[in-house]
Swiss-Prot record:
Leader sequence segment: 1-21
Protein's name according to its UniProt entry: Probable beta-galactosidase B
Disulfide bonds: C271-C324
Glycosylated residues, chain numbering: N23, N100, N211, N411, N456, N736, N776, N884, N925, N926
Organism classification: Eukaryota, Fungi, Dikarya, Ascomycota, Pezizomycotina
Amino acid sequence: MATAFWLLLFLLGSLHVLTAAQNSSQSEWPIHDNGLSKVVQWDHYSFYINGQRIFLFSGEFHYWRIPVPALWRDILEKIKAIGFTGFAFYSSWAYHAPNNQTVDFSTGARDITPIYDLAKELGMYIIVRPGPYVNAEASAGGFPLWLTTGAYGSTRNDDPRYTAAWEPYFAEVSEITSKYQVTDGHYTLCYQIENEYGQQWIGDPRDRNPNQTAIAYMELLQASARENGITVPLTGNDPNMNTKSWGSDWSDAGGNLDTVGLDSYPSCWSCDVSVCTGTNGEYVPYKVLDYYDYFQEVQPTMPFFMPEFQGGSYNPWDGPEGGCTEDTGADFANLFYRWNIGQRVSAMSLYMMFGGTNWGGIAAPVTASSYDYSAPISEDRSIGSKYYETKLLALFTRCAKDLTMTDRLGNGTQYTDNEAVIASELRNPDTNAAFYVTTHLDTTVGTDESFKLHVNTSKGALTIPRHGGTIRLNGHHSKIIVTDFNFGSETLLYSTAEVLTYAVFDRKPTLVLWVPTGESGEFAIKGAKSGSVAKCSGCSNIKFHRDSGSLTVAFTQGEGISVLQLDNGVRVVLLDRQKAYTFWAPALTDNPLVPEGESVLVSGPYLVRTARLARSTLTLRGDSKGETLEIFAPRKIKKVTWNGKAVEATRTSYGSLKAILAKPPSVELPTLNGWKYSDSLPERFPTYDDSGAAWVEIDANHMTTPNPNKPATLPVLYADEYGFHNGVRLWRGYFNSSASGVYLNIQGGAAFGWSAWLNGHFLGSHLGSASIQQANGTLDFPANTLNTEGTPNVLLVVHDDTGHDQTTGVLNPRGILEARLLSEASDNNDDDSPGFTHWRVAGTAGGESDLDPVRGVYNEDGLYAERVGWHLPGFDDSKWATVNGTSLSFTGATVRFFRTVIPPLSIPENTDVSISFVFSTPNVNNTSAGNTSAFRAQLFVNGYQYGRYNPYVGNQVVYPVPPGILDYNGENTIGVAVWAQTEAGARLNLDWRVNYVLGSSLDAGRLDLSFVAIAYVYIFECLQL
């Protein structure tokens, strides 16, 4: 009676829902193109490529955050292996334009053509996002820092000065991309103009009052893209649901793009969730947002497209070591990505898929060195539960062709017999295949709920499961229940177990289903009459029920893999979650959509990167820890190779091939010892000669600035106006008077710091705070620190910056806003109060001239050690003092540079080895009088600055450094610059560790590192004092 009652209730509710859906939909949605080609088209449902609908599942990576081109293959193969059909990347204007006369897309890791070539080889569509502004938690949002002086206007508008600045870069990246478009047989799918530029309207977008300046800017960008060969759709991304910009469905105002999408970070883009309340409201873990109504209102004739959906969160300076992985982990991936499918999203790109590292000075002040982003692929390139959980959905969306065209017929609790569980019904109007996306009614609770689901099928209305048991949602999870799911020539009438994937071998399909470990499932396959258990590993309670025209199978699956064989030739593989995590479907083709007969199924390894089939030989590449390999593939296969070596494979009774992979060897790292050191702050002494090429004279002629943020005192002491744009800068101010002190107000961004010395005597510091961007202080001049009359006094101010601000803050200056000598006259506002006679400033050696084009101008800053090349391989430190022991410690407020050279590492062949450096502060004295953690350290590895360690301000202690920066076959030069901000000095240790060792086709010890050859050359002749 209960079942009949619920079924009747469901049928009555469905009648209303279906009628409402039909009344609000169109029988024919327009198919759009951009008028240049019909290769890429789109409509209300999805994108088309060459007439075939696609579900675009993509993930973002930034090549400039992993400046080792040989490792781009590693990241992109992992993105492909997860089941994605595409990837996205920002191009960084800053990375390619060290000055306003240079656009470099050819040197080292600045050559982006390997990315396009890899996309073609691996079979993935690309969303190219060239800016000019990209945000990305990059310094100045990816703008080159020479743009931040104010001389180019306020930016992101149609100011001719700004236009002249971006046009050479934008033309170059467009021209390069134009050779790799899907319209010409390559895989660039679309080209995003600007980023999160929701400025089309003045005021409320519903008033549709056009912002003509923003419209003119967008039209200039579009014209440039087209003039330089871009023929694929031009796209945009709204930053949130409030801006409603650039879509022709919303308005026919100027500047509209071909297609637009919506960015969303429902759990906050930062580990500091307070920064998101203005967009998302109060943070509640696992609270989902409604997108369906937004898309229906704003872009009903376009695909529901999310160019950025939350793949993790960046970690601010005061965030936890390792980031906030628990906030956006495997459960987040399970729930939120399925929720989006229930919202009818058919194109989604995760930001980030791989974050990488903010090496050098590329970060904005909001984050430290790590850009791990809690992404599915970690900063150290490892994969874990979040990656595997995402794969469970991605492989499904790749094989579920009917998901590319669905109407949402309803959503609510009427679909279930448990009022705590809701479902959204998506149905393909052409095939009648349906997808029921089930979640908790309140997604924030995560309770253990069991339920039955009311569905409509080609066999009529059913309540499933039909033969006992229930469907279960245990925790912050979602399940997609399919009906009339087509696989090969067969039809899955329904399944309460989720579909992972399927493949067709020898004209017979193999269907792969999974459930959480220990849960039950039930599925029905049309046309089958009987079945048998070919393998039972963890299975129980398997029962076959013959129904009218179909066979229903009920089962429970514990940890393991079970295989069923049906009489119609269908093979069904049953997996629990853990086995599903390491079950792969590598493509045999470079077609991103992977036709059903163009893949094999592989179980066991940590990662399966690629598969190729030639005659009777199956060639697999991947990473392993010594697992058992099981392959479901065509019967013609007689030989299997793994990473180029034949493996002894035996055939099972149910048709698979099994082999045991070798365990990788262990790797031990040598001790980091043999340290030497030298003082790196000679500039604090009045006898230092600052007349060299490294120093720029600042005199009374520099009394104005184009920056709208004016200084309080003159001359202008904004570092960017003198060509020094990142990291540490040194200012030497000269005066002749008998001042009693100095007032300084300095701006360097969140977490920055400064210190000051008078004639070699330490005066004081701003130690820094994650929340303070600008800091002032009054410093008294102690007795006997001033020189006698006739000898000038020298005030040295050392400050760093943590990057330039983003969005509207890109013009916020970096440098000294106010420098005022104090005396009795100044206290009385006397015109004869003392002043500085002149200043000199030093920063990155060569300024904008890019002396080291491989590492680039963002790698070094202005410390003496960097200006003269102590951090580079090849420097002769034989006359330096030797550190006793392994602690890099000293007393006194100064900068000391430590350096050691480590003999070649013993990295075995055919492995991938990941290594991190780990800082610690032993026996730290945190009293105000003797704080030995009040220092700022920079880690250099073979000349690359690969970590900023500020223990007084931030919490990051682990710094992954990839192969290619670390030389796995030669010596490694390790340097640490330590700036002690108190007289107590600094105490720190540096160690390193192996994150993992895998048997791997990557062969990390033998990468092609030809791109770094110039970077390892000793370049003293270019460096400056």
